[in-house]
């Protein structure tokens, strides 16, 4: 028995070492695009297999493979579109989707990027630390060469800052997820209206608390309820809790990260050297979410102003409409705030998007298509670091038609045309539901990694097919598409996720 145990331990150790070597080789020798694509596809396939193997809670429901692959891709790309009713899934399947959203979230990938960059810094010492030969030179030559050599203290402190950031980001994620889950669980336990909804739907309260917190913090958008947060539209406290978690994991993360570092420096919980260096030389650290002071302030002001403007416009267009039916003035403002935040990030909806004024839907579509300020700031820093000449050389080497074909506008136009071709029969027989605008809205939502959808309503059908009854299904608009249309949207999800540069945290210097 001890011999078998020894063989098992040695085999396990060999397998772990081999896996670590393969991961290091891939991380150090492949391009970031190939690494991200491989990571997404591997997690996506594993998630798809897990969802297929596990059985739904509704034993009469047998989901198609296309729908399960669509759902797995939606979770991996943290979009939140679903072509099935979420309440038909079992608790184990909801747990798998929650894990997929976390593993492929921009926050977790940023953490992995920090860990990888820190390990690179530790593994490869700078060349100026190695003494290959000693040459006798004049004092004047030594004085001229000295300023060109980077300071050893500067290199060491950058290494320590990366290690420091690894622990800060890890603690940040753990605290937000644990605290958020506990707060949501406590709210549900003490507010009868929210608790009754979960009881009526037979959803585990603890699982819902964890799933909705992970979904909000990672901007995943997949919730265990069929109607997303529409059933909680009257629960102001719950919506405000989720708004804070969404902002903490997305656009305002650079603001909160800088506040955390500033607080740690003030509390003197660690050496003051690392926080001071990061506060004063944030761009030198190489973490795209750690912005300089002025950019952080500008980001906070612009995001708050943008959300406030959206709330005002949304309320003006929908205040007395059926969108806010049965809600008080405070609940209307809270729901407008929730929608304004989600139109940029998580894609969770507390109202029916099909009832929203067309002008507000156009505004949402623009918000979904517009990149975040963090991405723009990161691109500006990379442009300053690399220089404008490289951009000129790159642009000259690419033909105009090739650039247009792979641009977001060209790609989305192609996807919209393909979906219109695959759904051309439904476009002619059901023009109110399968309108061109709804298709454009769905494609932009998928490519922008948001997840808002106009849905589908049997009451809007103009022609009822004989012998075929239309049943209301609480899932996204793409759930009514054909299988080729769904697969095209899956491609849009993956390309939109790969095009997002927010997942790249530690830039190679």
Swiss-Prot record:
It is found in: Membrane. Residues 1-32, 117-164, 258-296, 374-400, 495-509 are cytoplasmic. Its main location: membrane. One of its GO terms (biological process) is metal ion transport. The keyword Ion transport applies. One of its GO terms (molecular function) is monoatomic cation transmembrane transporter activity. The chain crosses the membrane at residues 33-53, 96-116, 165-185, 237-257, 297-317, 353-373, 401-421, 474-494. GO terms for cellular component: plasma membrane. Pfam families: TrkH. It is a multi-pass membrane protein. The keyword Oxidoreductase does not apply. It comes from the Eukaryota. HKT transporters are proposed to contain 4 pore-forming regions enclosed by transmembrane segments with each containing a potassium channel-like selectivity filter motif. Probable cation transporter. May be involved in regulation of potassium-sodium homeostasis. Belongs to the TrkH potassium transport family. HKT (TC 2.A.38.3) subfamily. This is Probable cation transporter HKT2;3. It comes from Oryza sativa subsp. japonica.
